[in-house]
Swiss-Prot record:
Cross-referenced PROSITE patterns: RDRP_DSRNA_REO
Top-level taxon in the UniProt lineage: Viruses
Disulfide bond residue pairs: none
Protein name: RNA-directed RNA polymerase
Lineage: Viruses, Riboviria, Orthornavirae, Duplornaviricota, Resentoviricetes
Main location group: virion
Catalysed reactions listed for this entry: RNA(n) + a ribonucleoside 5'-triphosphate = RNA(n+1) + diphosphate
Location within or outside the cell: Virion
One BP annotation, GO: viral genome replication
Keyword Cell wall biogenesis/degradation: no
Keywords: Hydrolase, Nucleotidyltransferase, RNA-directed RNA polymerase, Transferase, Viral RNA replication, Virion
Principal EC category: transferase
One of the record's GO molecular function terms: RNA-directed RNA polymerase activity
Length: 1255
């Protein structure tokens, strides 16, 4: 039986004809049967031992590999009850010494047989080592293995098969035919020996067929194949790299898959500098400080002594451990690469070998010691002292030291120049209100006793652990110092965090009270570090401007980069190092007079000055409440033990105090410490030697640092040694990467003047937390975000469109909800229900009648590109006259561009000429007349819109926030927190909102300053997981509303911005990109893996120019047309409400501004935005702008002026010109794959924009 024929053709061609929509639904529905799904993904011959593969690598050079299938694939080793797998000490040491942290490769059947044999007579007990091994193995196999992001692992396998082209498209004689259908061959290799799907997913767990024999690591290997498809579609690897990677993954799985990958991953990818060292000189883009390329520069490569030593050490370590076939590939890459760009291609491929895209998940107790065990790496750091003591004999930094022979003194030498500005900035800060705003709806880690929340409704009880709710419950206790002390002295709870490419971490789940004391240093140090210029998140803009410093300095001779990473920084922070931060923070807090902070009030305090050789001298100082809280925190938050409540072995306490990694100040503490270590040490050496330092730039974020040194080679090498020793003096061990041409910072690399991203860090199919019930829009929005993150790191992002559609069709085009049987049957019998193949699922286990039934229906494929649905770039669809809409583009800008498809597919050229251009009265009200109902029906648009009508957020509000008792509880919780906010401002806001209410304008809580806290508590309530009862009640809102019975015109309604839909763009005759200032550079030199000569983005950049060069008077108007009002000072909801007030009751606008608590810049921004809105009469063409999608280029259209043709005459007004630019950008981004450098013709009815706007 041939499966998914039309679906495969559609995804591979990305074209959809009228009659294929219903066929795709029918084909996808076939995969509801597990045996058919198994048949589809294994429809190929398995890979065989001894099979020889020959083909081109990612750079086109021929390579060969003889495949070998390890024995465990068909015959996994059985569980042996006599063997100890995860030795447990049965003491406070826990799993102190054990060879493996992650899942071992064993036969699942033998594990479940052993468990069943024991549980026939008794329960498994952790008191017996063999029982404990079984409990751990079961959890790792069923729970830690489950990482599916979008749908079940099996449907994700279908998506991988759909996205991968089964046949080689070109007639390449060097490529062996056995590379055809490669993905299905990989799946067949793993699954055909089993003969069926060996497990299914339920509630974030795998439920295994206990009589089926298969390897425990099978799910991880399936995810790894899915990831290989992702990387293949992105152009990062070719088929031969897929074979090598799959071979490596299978080899890693012989004993312990994840442990082996961790052991080798750094060694496999440690060869980049060695690969680049073969080039004596490299042509690099010459970036200016504003982010513009002026020309290219040829830079001689300088290999320092440090770099040569590091390269030699890396090669020796690699050759001692890495499998031979991977070593051969790396040596092949070093030898065959003819340019730095090809070296980068090969290096990215080896990163994929090292990282399969899965998360390193395990039982937290197993990885605890490696995650948090304290260690002293280099030096024991002395505690900072002060000559002043409090009455409790605590050192207090009334003044800063001047000496340079202590770490504290060195730190102060660097930062004291910023202190006056810092104090001025902080003086008007309301620390209490800032802390309340800091609280989120994440878990606080605190379990409330039943008595403490017994008076609250069930709705509140379910979310009591959320930070904002927990703070409301204990808000009055924040005025009690004893309560704060008791809460802080309790051991912090550790929680495991899994990551891609890094071992499992343990994060301290810091409760609200600890956060309360840890918040002031975070706020103070964040403000300080902003001033020093050494701190950088590295990702503020999300585009190349974040990398401008290393990009700009790369072409210069005598510049050396040193990327340094502190090994295990959380575990290496000594208590004395923390005290240095606290001493500084206390000193700053002492300057902020009369700043109270919860239980800590300002007042006079007696302190004692230690005078050498004399008795201490008592004196009185004024101490702010903030300083008192910081003094208390110095001792309450450190030293601190943590406890892990493991659901297998119970409670484990860390043996020694460790750094509280979950504290608000964790990142700024590390940044502050490393900045001071390097800058303080540099200042000391400069002053002692009277010689200038070669340190040109320092950036630090957490445990990541990058120094850029400029000067003679010998001086630089000495300074780099000094910088490492400065960090060592603070007790840290540093790993350096020194180079004149490549550097890494925060997982972003600049190499040879280009951006080289890490595509292996993006996983589309695996997630830290398995999938939850999400709408299609939520799922596809997440996929879009990941794809654009991957695209800018990859060679061929256009191919990712096919992958997005494969994921959408296989994983997101169905919805399963719980509802009442009669309602479900009524929907199934409806026209929409029949079209969407709706059915009631038969449960595997009989359910109670009051639990309702599970209804499943399928979305038409058109739902994937509608604005209410997935918002993917629309497939190429056929119009009435046989012409097609544009081919879907990776650079497509979501939003109103999706709505434009209604007009694009409806308007033939003949209709445009005879109907559109012949009339001059078009506006946003009558634009809807131009859509073709019949053609939209042919693409099942009505069915798609009807099926997408289930709005979970709105219906959840009705369910949870309608009970009076819940509303009362929310008010009570908020009142406790509001007591710490600006009470006068709250009162003013409340009175203004009451006046608006009396005038007939009722505002939602989320825009009101006075009800900001209530709104955030409500958000926490809405985010709680749904109960079965809520699922049923929520579905009833949708089905009883009968929205699925509406007509197409009821579902596609007019919008105020529909005027912008009446346009047509096409390629012109003029070749315009030759005049671009960047053309000569991008046609010869790569800027990144995505931008290289001849790439799609290299053409687009010649149209848009670089972001650094973005300027022009029309930028503001184009922004207004895109719906960008207020410059980020006001929220979208605030502006939406303000528009209605402005148009209907403008005299109430000032009351609205007061009620929202807007002032200064925000008030001015709102009034300017409303004025612009009035001028535009609400016309806009709003699109989503993702920085990484246009990593280098301007994505607004404002720079396209020289590339436009105006067949209906040059625009007569500025707004009409801005509209032409915006519509041209929409065309360019939607048609990027057909871009050849020609001009863009924008066709708009003459004078339409001038008539419909006030500009």
């Amino acid at each position: 039986m041939t499966l998914l024929v039309i679906t495969e053709q559609t995804i591979h061609s990305l074209c959809l004809d009228h009659g294929e929509t219903n066929q795709i639904i029918a084909e996808i529905k076939q995969l509801e049967k597990p045996e058919l799904l198994f048949s589809y993904i294994t429809d190929a011959e398995p890979l065989a031992t001894g099979e020889v593969f020959v083909g081109p690598d990612i750079c086109g050079n021929c390579i060969t590999h003889t495949f070998r299938v390890p024995d465990y694939v068909a015959k996994p080793p059985p569980y042996d009850s006599k063997r100890v797998y995860y030795p447990y000490s049965y003491t406070c040491l826990g799993f102190d010494s054990h060879p493996y942290d992650y899942l071992l490769t064993l036969d699942t059947k033998s594990i479940f047989q052993a468990i069943r044999k024991i549980t026939l007579t008794r329960k498994l007990s952790i008191a017996t080592q063999s029982d404990l091994d079984l409990i751990i193995l079961k959890k790792l196999t069923t729970q830690s293995n489950c990482q599916s992001r979008v749908s079940s692992i099996w449907r994700q396998c279908v998506a991988a098969c759909l996205a991968f082209e089964p046949q080689i498209q070109n007639n390449n004689s060097t490529q062996s035919p056995n590379l055809n259908n490669l993905v299905k061959r990989m799946f067949a290799t793993l699954l055909k020996p089993i003969g069926r799907l060996p497990f299914y997913e339920r509630r974030r767990n795998f439920v295994w067929e206990e009589e089926v024999s298969c390897p425990t690591i099978l799910p991880l290997l399936l995810y790894s194949i899915q990831n290989l498809v992702t990387q293949f579609c992105a152009g990062v690897i070719n088929r031969m790299e897929m074979i090598l990677a799959f071979q490596y993954y299978l080899d890693c799985g012989v004993t312990a898959y994840q442990d082996e990958k961790l052991r080798l991953q750094k060694l496999i990818r440690n060869w980049l500098r060695e690969g680049l060292a073969k080039f004596s000189k490299i042509a690099m883009p010459n970036w200016t400080v504003s982010g513009v390329i002026s020309c290219t520069t040829v830079k001689p490569i300088m290999i320092t002594t440090h770099e040569a030593r590091e390269i030699k050490s890396a090669r020796e370590a690699r050759e001692a451990s890495v499998p031979t076939y991977l070593l051969q590939y790396i040596n092949h890459a070093i030898h065959k690469a003819i340019s730095p760009y090809q070296t980068h291609q090969y290096w990215q491929a080896t990163r994929v070998f090292a990282n399969d895209g899965t998360y390193f998940a395990s039982v937290a107790a197993l990885t605890l010691n490696k995650a948090v065990r304290p260690r002293i790496e280099e030096t024991t750091v002395k505690y900072p002292n002060s000559r002043y003591l409090t009455m409790n004999k605590e050192h207090i930094a009334v003044s800063l030291p001047n000496e340079t022979d202590t770490n504290f003194g060195l730190a102060c030498q660097f930062v004291k120049q910023f202190i006056p500005r810092l104090v001025t900035r902080l003086k008007n800060t309301n620390f209490q209100e800032e802390f309340i705003a800091f609280l989120t709806s994440s878990s606080s880690g605190k379990d409330f006793e039943d008595a403490a929340i017994a008076t609250m409704t069930r709705t509140i009880q379910r979310v009591a652990k959320k930070r904002i709710v927990a703070a409301g419950l204990e808000s009055r206790s924040y005025l009690n110092q004893q309560f704060i002390a008791d809460e802080c002295l309790a051991a912090a709870k550790l929680v495991g965090r899994t990551q891609i490419g890094r071992r499992q971490r343990a994060i301290a789940g810091v409760n609200n009270t600890r956060s309360l004391l840890g918040f002031p240093p975070m706020l103070m140090l964040k403000a300080l570090l902003d001033m020093t210029g050494t701190t950088s998140s590295g990702k503020q803009m999300g585009n190349y401007l974040d990398l401008l410093i290393p990009l700009g300095l790369s072409p210069y001779a005598n510049v050396i980069f040193n990327s340094a990473d502190v090994d295990a920084m959380d575990a290496s922070v000594q208590a004395s190092v923390q005290q240095i931060m606290w001493h500084f923070v206390v000193y700053i807090a002492l300057q902020l007079e009369r700043t109270d902070y919860f239980a800590f009030t300002s007042g006079d305090e007696v302190i004692y000055e230690l005078v050498e050789g004399k008795d201490s001298v008592a004196t009185s100082i004024h101490m702010s409440g903030l300083a008192r809280s910081c003094l208390r925190a110095m001792h309450l938050l450190q030293p601190q033990n943590c406890v892990l409540n493991d659901d297998i072995v119970g409670e484990l306490v860390t043996r020694e105090p460790t750094f509280p990694s979950g504290q608000p100040f964790t990142t700024v503490h590390h940044t502050f410490t490393l900045s001071n270590a390097i800058m303080g040490g540099t200042l000391r050496v400069t002053n002692l030697t009277n010689q200038p330092s070669t340190l040109l730039n320092l950036t630090v974020q957490g445990d990541d640092t990058r120094t850029i040194n400029y000067g003679p080679k010998g001086c630089i090498e000495k300074c780099i040694d000094d910088q490492s020793s400065f960090v060592s003096d603070w007790g840290f061990k540093v790993s350096n990467e020194t180079s004149s041409h490549t550097s890494e910072y925060l997982q972003q690399r600049v190499s040879c003047g280009t951006f080289v991203g890490y595509p292996d860090r993006v996983s589309l199919f695996a997630a830290e937390r398995p999938k939850e019930g999400k709408t299609m829009k939520e799922k596809m929005s997440e996929i879009w975000s990941l794809v654009t993150d991957l695209g800018c790191r990859s060679r061929d992002p256009q191919r990712l469109v096919r992958l997005m559609y494969a994921i959408g069709v296989a994983c997101c085009c169905r919805l399963t909800i719980r509802t009442e049987r009669l309602v479900a049957e009524e929907f199934i019998a409806s026209e929409v229900g029949r079209a969407c193949c709706a059915e009631i699922l038969v449960p595997k286990v009989a359910a109670r009648a009051d639990r309702g039934v599970m209804l499943r229906y399928h979305y038409p494929i058109s739902a994937l590109w509608l604005e209410e649905g997935g918002q993917l770039p629309p497939l190429a669809t056929k119009r009435r006259d046989g012409t097609w809409t544009c081919f879907p583009s990776y650079y497509f800008q979501r939003g109103d561009s999706n709505r434009y498809w209604y007009w694009d597919v409806s308007l033939t050229e003949e209709k445009w000429i005879t109907t559109v251009e012949m009339r001059s009265d078009w506006d946003s009200n009558n634009a809807i007349e131009l859509i073709d109902d019949e053609i939209l029906e042919a693409y099942a648009t009505r069915y798609a819109l009807a099926a997408l009508g289930l709005n979970k957020t709105r219906q959840m509000e009705r369910l949870r926030l309608s009970e009076e008792s819940t509303i009362f509880d929310v008010e009570q919780l908020a009142s406790g927190l509001n007591a710490y906010r600006n009470l006068s401002k709250i009162a003013i806001s409340h009175r203004a909102s009451e006046r608006l209410k009396n005038a007939g304008v009722e505002l939602p809580d989320s825009v009101l300053y006075s009800r900001h806290t209530q709104s955030r508590i409500q958000d926490a309530i809405l985010k709680a997981q749904m109960t079965e009862k809520e699922e049923i009640e929520m579905s009833l809102y949708f089905f009883k509303d009968k929205g699925y019975l509406r007509s197409l015109r009821e579902l596609v309604k007019s919008k105020s911005g529909d005027l912008a839909m009446i346009h047509r763009c096409e390629w012109g005759e003029r070749v315009t990109i030759l005049e671009s200032s960047i053309f000569n550079v991008v046609s010869t030199t790569p800027l990144s893996m995505e931008v290289y000569p001849g790439s799609i983005m290299s053409f687009i950049l010649c149209y848009t120019g670089l972001k650094g060069a973005h300027s022009g008077q029309l930028a503001g108007l184009v922004g207004l047309l895109q719906g960008k009002y207020g410059g980020g000072k006001i929220s979208e909801l605030q502006f939406s409400i303000a528009k209605k007030i402005y148009l209907t009751k403008p005299y109430l606008l000032n009351e609205f501004i007061i009620a929202c608590g807007l002032g200064g810049e925000a008030e001015l921004a709102l009034k300017n935005a409303l004025h612009a809105f009035e001028m535009l009469r609400g016309v806009e063409f709003s699109t989503v702008h993702t920085p990484r999608q246009f990593f280098f280029g301007v994505d607004s259209g404002v720079t396209l002026g020289n590339h436009l043709d105006y067949p209906n005459g040059f625009p007569g007004t500025r707004i009409e010109l801005a509209a032409h630019l915006l519509l041209a950008m929409n065309f360019l981004s939607s048609n990027a794959q057909s871009c050849t450098g020609r001009s863009i013709r924008v066709r708009v009815p003459r004078g339409m924009w001038s008539r419909c706007t006030n500009f």
